[in-house]
Amino acid sequence: MDIEKYNMLQRNYTKKNKKLNLVSLLIISIIELISIIILIMKKSSIELIITTTIIELIVLLLVLVIIKITLFSNDKKEIYELYLKIKEELVLKVLKKHFTNITYNQSKGLTESFIRKEGLMSTGDIYSSNDSISGIYKNIKFCQSDINIEEEKEEKDDEGNVTTYYETVFRGRWLVFDFNKEFKSNLIVESGAFPNLVYGQEYMDIEIEDVEFNNSFNIYAQNEHEAFYILTPSFIEKLKKIDKKIQSAGIRFLFNNNKLHIGINNSDDAFEFDELKEINEQEIEANMENDIRLIMDLIDELDLTNDLFKK
């Protein structure tokens, strides 16, 4: 692994950047000082001196940005390419400790068409997904990806001017597991904080006897009988335990085509580390272990290996 090379590149980049900043600050200060002295000698007005100084400062800063881009573009490209290579090696290293039949693609994820086709959630106006992982844990097949969804919003001020901006409505992980019961109809169980509530008329809003669960979750079912077949009292307790353990902004359990989908809206990207810092391999591996632990915990806590009800 090229961690030593990566850290050396980061150190060199930081030194060059600091040196350029200091030199630039000195040059800008000298130029501005000379300009002010010349304007004072010409007996220019205070307004002209201030305006000229501001314009010169903006121009000089723009020149500095251009110089930085020109000088450091190759360095940043080399660092980023090495970052991607090391990240893939670290992720695969940790995955292989726990799973079999592993595939990992950091640039691809669950496609927008898949999310739409399966009716998992609204994909908003801007959709992206990466860090696709699939594998087997205790004979249970799974896959997961990071997903980011943004929706276009408009804001009107008092004068009627409209400003368009994009708001992140989902940023987190989407996981898919083989489920240990067979069913024909879809079922959605989600915490009240989960966004993207887009359902057709075929869903009905139902409640169960567990008041605490009803207060924390919304349940939408296509078939009430199948919903209660899946949501046994013991399974409900497992869902409550998972929800408390994850503590995200929202969580969705979606039962679809004999699969269990779990969306976790926690404003986080799994398996990432700061590309602007030197790599601490042990620390990064520990963080990745935590990200991977979630997959194992969900399979274990929800008892997905129990195939008693499989037909």
Language model feature labels by segment:
Residues 1-20:
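Cytosolic juxtamembrane N-terminal segments of multi-pass membrane proteins
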Residues 1-7, 80-98:
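Juxtamembrane membrane-interface segments of multi-pass membrane proteins
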Residues 20, 62-90:
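Transmembrane-cytosolic junction motif
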Residues 21-41, 56-60:
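Canonical alpha-helical transmembrane segments of integral membrane proteins
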Residues 40-51:
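Membrane-helix interface and helix-disruption motif detector
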Residues 50-67:
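Hydrophobic alpha-helical transmembrane segments of integral membrane proteins
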Residues 92, 96-101, 105-155, 161-311:
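Charged, low-complexity intrinsically disordered regions
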